Amino acid sequence: MSEHLIVKNKKAYFNYEIIQTYQAGIVLNGPEIKSIRNHDVSINEAFVLIRKKEIYILNMNVKKYQFANYIKGLEETRTRKLLLHKKEIIKILNKIKQENLTIIPIKLYFKNDYVKLEIALAKGKKLHDKRQTIKKRDTERKELRDYK
């Protein structure tokens, strides 16, 4: 099982406290796959919604593949369906309702030639939590420098 990282949402770990992660497949078209292989994709502005017990990713930007003839209506930031088991979707839905959590995309990667998206149940950090994270990171860097 080889995993090849395509893109990572770096701001997710800074803006959110990650509670649990899930691996989901994505419904894509042929030209979108080729564009993703060229790393012409961004998940920084993307978010995940659950509608009628189906899960979707919105605002994931997949640039148009330059050598493909495009179908009308195929937008770069269109809504794409995520593939998860019904039990997982229901479990996620229950946790969101109980604990006031959000679903965010963490990373996009290839696993055995299939594009997978790692999504996470997360809780938003407050401003003082972000400051604590920055201070903690700075002290760790300083200790490493002093250690060397």
UniProtKB/Swiss-Prot annotation:
SUPFAM superfamilies: Small protein B (SmpB). Disulfide bonds: none annotated. GO terms for molecular function: RNA binding. It is found in: Cytoplasm. PROSITE patterns: SSRP. Coiled coil: none annotated. The keyword rRNA processing does not apply. Its main location: cytoplasm. The keyword Transcription does not apply. Keywords: Cytoplasm, RNA-binding. Transmembrane segments: none annotated. GO terms for biological process: trans-translation. One of its GO terms (cellular component) is cytosol. HAMAP family: SmpB. Required for rescue of stalled ribosomes mediated by trans-translation. Binds to transfer-messenger RNA (tmRNA), required for stable association of tmRNA with ribosomes. tmRNA and SmpB together mimic tRNA shape, replacing the anticodon stem-loop with SmpB. tmRNA is encoded by the ssrA gene; the 2 termini fold to resemble tRNA(Ala) and it encodes a 'tag peptide', a short internal open reading frame. During trans-translation Ala-aminoacylated tmRNA acts like a tRNA, entering the A-site of stalled ribosomes, displacing the stalled mRNA. PANTHER family: SSRA-BINDING PROTEIN, TMRNA-BINDING COMPONENT OF TRANS-TRANSLATION TAGGING COMPLEX. Belongs to the SmpB family. This is SsrA-binding protein. The lineage of its organism: Bacteria, Bacillati, Mycoplasmatota, Mollicutes, Mycoplasmataceae.
